[in-house]
Amino acid sequence: MLKLLLGDPNARKLKRYQPLVSDINLLEEDIAPLSDEDLRRRTSEFRQQLENAGSLERQRPVLDQLLPEAFAIVREAGKRVLGMRHFDVQLLGGMVLHDGQIAEMKTGEGKTLVATLPSYLNALTGRGVHVVTVNDYLARRDAEWMGQVHRFLGLSVGLIQQDMSPAERRQNYGCDVTYATNSELGFDYLRDNMATDISEVVQREFQYCVIDEVDSILVDEARTPLIISGQVERPQEKYNQAAALALQLDRAAEMSKDGIDPEGDYEVDEKQRSVILTDEGYAKAESILGVEDLFNAADPWAHYVTNALKAKELFIKDVNYITRDNEVVIVDEFTGRVMPGRRWSDGLHQAVEAKESMPIQPETQTLASITYQNFFLLYPRLAGMTGTAKTEEVEFEKTYKLEVTVVPTNRTRARRDLVDQVYKTETGKWRAVAQETAEVHRTGRPVLVGTTSVEKSEVLSALLQEEGIPHNLLNAKPENVEREAEIVAQAGRTGAVTIATNMAGRGTDIILGGNTDYMARLKVREALLPRLVRPEEGHRPPVPLQREASSGFAAAASAPAKPPSEARALGRLYPCELSPDTDAALADVARELVKLWGDRTLTVLELEDRISSAAEKAPSEDAGIMQLRQVLAQIRADYDAVISTEQASVRETGGLHVIGTERHESRRVDNQLRGRAGRQGDPGSTRFFLSLEDNLLRIFGGDRVAGLMNAFRVEEDMPIESGMLTRSLEGAQKKVETYYYDMRKQVFEYDEVMNNQRRAVYVERRRVLEGRDLKKQVLGYGERTMDDIVEAYVNPELPPEEWDLSHLTNKVKEFVYLLQDLEPQQLAGLSMEELKAFLHEQLRIAYDLKEAEIEQLKPGLMREAERFFILQQIDSLWREHLQSMDALRESVGLRGYGQKDPLIEYKNEGYDMFLEMMTQVRRNVIYSMFMFQPQPAPAQEDEAVV
């Protein structure tokens, strides 16, 4: 009703931008005839105008005035360099981003191109713009591909990759537009704030940031803090003993009610992802381990036992992690990709290693940490784009103060979303999925099936194998990950069947009829691998692993193997043989490249990098890449001839059919899977198959669903369609989203306390690092320390003759040994304020004496010592403080039982602990400075040794 009266707020926002779009379209005629040099000259003129404006606040209105002309220039540059012209809806998206909002743009609408508009405009200030993507490959691709537009217009483009040195990072952060991943940005920020010299700092002050796949970074990853840690030694045998103990303890069938423990040793709360021992469980664990108390501070066991039980019950192999090369590797629950190098904290990873009988790696101690939420709030202006943001609109507004604007699609959507089919059991559901896949496959339409875990994708694969349907499997298992590009390249071909685990973050579009660009790359890779890559690197032929009888399933051993010719036909990757001319050209290029790049000297990654550069339009100095580019175009032309007819037939039969096999905890991830079909106005359809045994319904659907299960006396393979059930599903998803939102909000609120402390420490640290007024700072520390001593030993309510001046002078001498001749009589008769002023004066005199003594040895050594001691104290005490804050956070939750708000308790106590830490820093620095006795350098050296 409100919408009818007031109109759609989203439409109102878009209407506001419409006049600007018209202005840009009018400017197009004036800008098209300009020469390349003229366009670059405009960039310099814009920069001059902004420089004249001065501060960032004053530059903002100037940027808004320049917007129409700047966008028109970027559109023209895009046409000239990339052969791509920004559509009107892309201009709208650019304006939304420039205004510091989130632009929701559907899959395939060219989000990457949209980012060039606001990043060019905001880079004109010279303060740097960061464009953030989810992985290194996408950052590199965008920097090479979209970076051409910026370079063409005279801006510098930087790229941050995982293996770069600090010097390379500093150079790239110094560019006008820098492409990077969210984790690299965050870790560089933390490393900068651990630097011991200003020359080690790589980032400059933040200004403007555009995040691609913003929901993935600001919502999905918001619960995971970025942590830099150092190793600490802990007894490894405890993990193994705890893992063995976990196997001897029995899980309770239900949760405790009204404080009464259930039968069993421990209860598992899947919703909270926690494990709690019952009283019986505590007694049993203590007796098996032969200890009196699991919580004994001298020999603690509780932490190890709880982690071992979590590893047993909540961390499932092939769902949460996979094992390879004798290591436990985490699987990202949102993207289905493995995350090598990432480890769970608090001893959890070690518990999983013990459970899997793998070598246990040392535990770590946090040296610095920040959440993505607080990290991205450091940017004065933040913007983001994604295909699905509307469902999380409230969170974006409350946590990040970011509005969401839905940008219309360029062409009308032709996708059909079919009604969900719900089955009573999981077995019935999987049979139905296999049946639907088979039926659609026989019509010649491509099918994409999304599963939620590696294990489930293997189950479906086995069922399709029984039906004799050729298919490709894409999950976190190493043998499949390597084939990701090939599998996605042909997922849109006639009759292709692809099973993918969490298709959410995968950056490749599924193109109807097949992706000829990818197929051409793979053909080139196949021809060049044996000639250019080192033999020890090893390589596999790029014919995808069709899941045939020989694919390693135990049940498959007795199944009759397909004749080789048929199996090969099913797995054929390329749409046709190359023409003799193209074949000869490819062989020639391969020979030339051996001469240019050496015989089998590259790694697989280096070769793939070069093929990627050749496949994109970025200008290159390398003759080899230019030759590769020509042959790629030739191969693509051969394939296009065949694929264009295949594309037409796939369109006619109805396009890609997407099947979801379980509702994800977030509606957004379901929408991302649906968005794979019907991109850019293509036809397509989607359907979800669910069962009452699915995790989502089991954990969050609650008793209503259990009641429904008993009420439906239906066969396994009969779909249930009921309004109440659909509402239950929607309700369950909303419940989960709210639950996780509350968790993220809680993480945010608790980290907010840490964030204020972190900022204060980092500001202090940076001031020291830059060497500003170091002497003044140390004297300030000393004066505060003197004040603390006076306040500790002088009670203003007592008469002055009762003040404990002898203890006071002794305490002053402990800190400042140069005041050894200070006597209590000198202080007699002074008021409290006079006492403080007198000690400040004495401290200054003593400090000047100390400085003269040190400077005689080596000029400038005093300033170096000041910097060294302040940084050393801040760093070591901040590390201890982080540990204490973690411990406080763990324990503060219990205060809820005492009718106290845990967050307020955490804020108050955390603040007191922080003040105590800063006091400790001041005292330690003063003590260290006066005790500092540098050794005179040997005669042949002219440097003093600290």
Curated annotation (Swiss-Prot):
Matches recorded under Pfam families: P-loop_SecA (PF21090), SecA_DEAD (PF07517), SecA_PP_bind (PF01043), SecA_SW (PF07516)
EC identifiers of the protein: 7.4.2.8
List of residues binding ATP: 90, 108-112, 509
Top-level class of the enzyme under EC nomenclature: translocase
InterPro entries: Helicase_ATP-bd (IPR014001), P-loop_NTPase (IPR027417), SecA (IPR000185), SecA_CS (IPR020937), SecA_DEAD (IPR011115), SecA_motor_DEAD (IPR014018), SecA_preprotein_X-link_dom (IPR011130), SecA_SF2_C (IPR044722)
Thylakoid recorded as keyword: yes
Membrane topology annotation: Peripheral membrane protein
Keywords annotated in UniProt: ATP-binding, Cell inner membrane, Cell membrane, Cytoplasm, Membrane, Nucleotide-binding, Protein transport, Thylakoid, Translocase, Translocation, Transport
Catalytic reaction(s) noted: ATP + H2O + cellular proteinSide 1 = ADP + phosphate + cellular proteinSide 2
Superkingdom to which the source organism belongs: Bacteria
Subcellular location: Cell inner membrane; Cellular thylakoid membrane; Cytoplasm
One MF term in the entry's GO annotations: ATP binding
HAMAP family assigned to the protein according to its UniProt record, in alphabetical order: SecA
Quaternary structure and interacting proteins, as annotated: Monomer and homodimer. Part of the essential Sec protein translocation apparatus which comprises SecA, SecYEG and auxiliary proteins SecDF. Other proteins may also be involved.
Family statement drawn from the similarity comment of this UniProt entry: Belongs to the SecA family.
Protein name according to UniProt: Protein translocase subunit SecA
Source organism: Synechococcus sp. (strain RCC307)
Top-level taxonomy: Bacteria, Bacillati, Cyanobacteriota, Cyanophyceae, Synechococcales
Gene behind this protein: secA
